[in-house]
Amino acid sequence: MTSLNQRKDRLEFNKLQKRLRRQTGSAIVDYNMIEDGDKVMVCLSGGKDSYTMLDILLSLQQTAPIRFELVAVNMDQKQPGFPEHVLPNYLAQLGVPFHIIERDTYSIVKEVVPEGKTTCGLCSRLRRGTLYGFADEIGATKIALGHHRDDIIETLFLNMFYGGKLKAMPPKLLSDDKRNIVIRPLAYCAEEDIAEFARLKGFPIIPCNLCGSQENLQRQAVKEMLHAWERQFPGRTETIFTAIRNVQPSQLGDLELFDFVNLAIDKTATAVEDASDACAVPNWHRPAQEEVVQYVDVLDIH
C-alpha cells in the first residue's frame, strides 16, 4: 500500500512539475524574456516563489534551444534572526553561482516607518534599487523576480481599489532608467501550484521577520476576495488573468490610450444591413435571471 501511495505521489509531482515547466516556458517565449547569451540574475528571497523559480529555470536551462547563464542573488537586509547560512549552503550544494549582497535596509525601514505601519513599500523600494545597481555590476542582462499569476491579479485589484488605476504587474518590464529589464517567469503559474511544489521539494524556506509576520491588510483583503470568487465560480481567477492580457482600449475611457476626442463618422464605411437591429441584444446573449443574480453578488465588495 505504501509503495502504491509513493507511486501515486510521484505521478502527481511529475504532473505538477511538468505544468510549472510548461507555463514558465510559455511565459518566457510569449514575452521573449530570455534570449541567447543572456545573463539572468535570479533574485532569491528564501521564499517558496523564488526557490521554485530558480528550480524551474535550472531545469529549462538544460533543455532550452538557447544558451543562457543563471546567477542567483540574495540580499541580506540584516533582519534580526536571518539565517545567513541557509541560502549559501543550498546554492553551493546545487552548484549554482551566487552572490549575497549585504545591506542594512532593516535599520532604515525601522527608523523611517512608524510603528505598526506596513514596511513592505519602503523595503521593496530599497531592495529594488540595490538589485538594479548590482545587476549593472555583474553584467546581468535580465533580472528575474518570483512574482506569479496571483500576485499579478492581486496587484490589479489593489491599484483599482486603492490607487484608481487600471494597472497590474507586467511579465516583462523596462526599468525607468532603461538600464535593466525585469522578467517574471512565473507569471502564468498559480500560487497554489507553487506552494505545493515547494512543499514537495522541501525547500529550506526563510520567513521574513520584517514583514512576513506583518499582515498587509489591503492585499490580504483582495486575496480573500479572489479566493471567495474562485470557490463560488471556479475558473474566475484564470479568466481575470486572461482579461489582463486582452485589453481593448476603445472600450475603456483613457484619453491617452485611445483618441475618443477625434472620433468621426465615416459614411463610406460598409453599413450594417438592418440598422434597427444593430443595437439589439440577441436572445442567445441574454443571461438567465439566476445568472444576473450571480453577477450582482460578485459586485458586493466590502
From Swiss-Prot:
Q: In Gene Ontology terms, what is one molecular function of this protein?
A: 4 iron, 4 sulfur cluster binding
Q: Does the keyword Metal-binding apply?
A: yes
Is the keyword Thylakoid in the record? no
Q: Could you tell me what the cofactor note in this record states?
A: Binds 1 [4Fe-4S] cluster per subunit. The cluster is chelated by three Cys residues, the fourth Fe has a free coordination site that may bind a sulfur atom transferred from the persulfide of IscS.
Q: Give the range the annotation lists for the signal sequence.
A: none
Write down the superkingdom of origin: Bacteria
- Enzyme Commission code(s) on record: 2.8.1.-
What function is annotated for this protein? Answer: Catalyzes the ATP-dependent 2-thiolation of cytidine in position 32 of tRNA, to form 2-thiocytidine (s(2)C32). The sulfur atoms are provided by the cysteine/cysteine desulfurase (IscS) system.
PANTHER family in the record: AMINOTRAN_5 DOMAIN-CONTAINING PROTEIN, SULFURTRANSFERASE-RELATED
- Quaternary structure note: Homodimer.
Protein's UniProt name = tRNA-cytidine(32) 2-sulfurtransferase
Which organism is this entry from?
Cellvibrio japonicus (strain Ueda107) (Pseudomonas fluorescens subsp. cellulosa)
